[in-house]
Amino acid sequence: ARAQLAPVVFEGTSFGGALMTTTEVENFPGFRDGITGPELMDQMREQALRFGADLRMEDVESVSLQGRVKTVTTAEGETVRARSVILAMGAAARYLGVPGEQELLGRGVSSCATCDGFFFKDQDIAVIGGGDSAMEEATFLTRFARSVTLVHRREEFRASRIMLERAKANDKITILTNKAVEAVEGESTVTGVRLRDTGTGAVSTLAVTGVFVAIGHDPRSELVRDVLETDPDGYVLVQGRTTSTSIDGVFASGDLVDRTYRQAITAAGSGCSAAIDAERWLADHE
C-alpha cells in the first residue's frame, strides 16, 4: 500500500494465523516487555489499514495464476483480478486429534517450543513425537523445564542418529516408547497426558503441566500445489534468495516456503521481501 499500489488481502474468516493461539510473544523486536499474539496481529492489521490496504475476512476457494491477469475466487463466489499475487498461507502444525488437545491449546498445549518454552520454567513437560523436530524441541526445552518426557508411539525413531543421541545424553530428558497419547488432561490448564501402551494396552497418566506436540507441520499449499512447483512435502519452491515462484508474477513467503525457522519475525521479513519483489516486478511489466 505504501508503494501506491492497491493490495487486496484475503485474511480468511479467522485472521491472524498461528500467532492467534500464542499467549505471549517475547522475541519480536520492538516489544521490550513482550506482547500477546492477538495483540501483535491487531497492531499489524491496523498498520496495514492505515496505509490503505483492502483487508477482507473471506476464505479463498480457488486461484488462477497463469497468464498476465491472475484471479482469486472467494468462497462467496466473488472474483478479484490482479496482475501479481503474493501467497502467504503459512503452515499448520499437525496435532494429535485427541480429547483435551484443542481445548487446552495455549493453556499448556503448544506446538512451538521456541515460542512458548520460557513459560514452562521449572515445570515438568512432555514432548510428543519421534522425528528430528521432536528431539530438537525436547533438547531446547531442557533450558527451561525441570524435566522433559519424550513420548513416542513406536519403538523405533525417525530422528537422525545424532539428534536422538543428543536427546538420550541429556539428563533432563526421559524417553518413553510404545506409548500412544489417548488424551490431554486438565480443566483450565494441562495437568497430564493419558497414555496407552501400544504393546500391552495398559493405560497410565503422566503428570505434566505442558504438552508440546512435535509431529510436523503441513504447508497450506492445497490451492496451488497443482500449478506451482513444490517440494515433496508441499512447501512452495522459490528461486534463489528471492520470493519468486515457478510462475511469473506470483510470489510466496513466510511459513509456506520456510520449513526451518517458522518464527513471526522471519515470516514478517519474508513477507516484506515478497512485497518488494512484487513491486519491482510490476514496475518492470507495465
What are these regions (language model features)?
Residues F51, L55-K121, G130:
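Glycine/small-residue-rich loop that forms an oxyanion/phosphate-binding "nest" at active or ligand-binding sites
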Residues A1-F51, Q123-D124, G129, S133-R161, ...:
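Beta1-alpha1 glycine-rich phosphate/pyrophosphate-binding loop at the start
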Residues S14, A91-A93, D132-S133, D258:
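Residue-level detector of alpha-helix initiation sites
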Residues A1, A134, A138, A252-S253, ...:
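Small-residue (primarily alanine) positions within well-ordered alpha-helices
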Residues E11, G17, S62, G77-E78, ...:
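Short secondary-structure boundary/capping segments
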Residues A18, Y95-L96, M135-E136, R158, ...:
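Glycine/Thr-rich phosphate-binding loops of Rossmann-like dinucleotide-binding domains
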Residues A92, G97, Q102-F119, I215-R262, ...:
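FAD-site-proximal beta/loop scaffold in flavoenzymes
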Residues R45-T74, T79-A82, T142-G240, R280-E286:
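A Rossmann-like FAD-binding core segment of flavoenzymes
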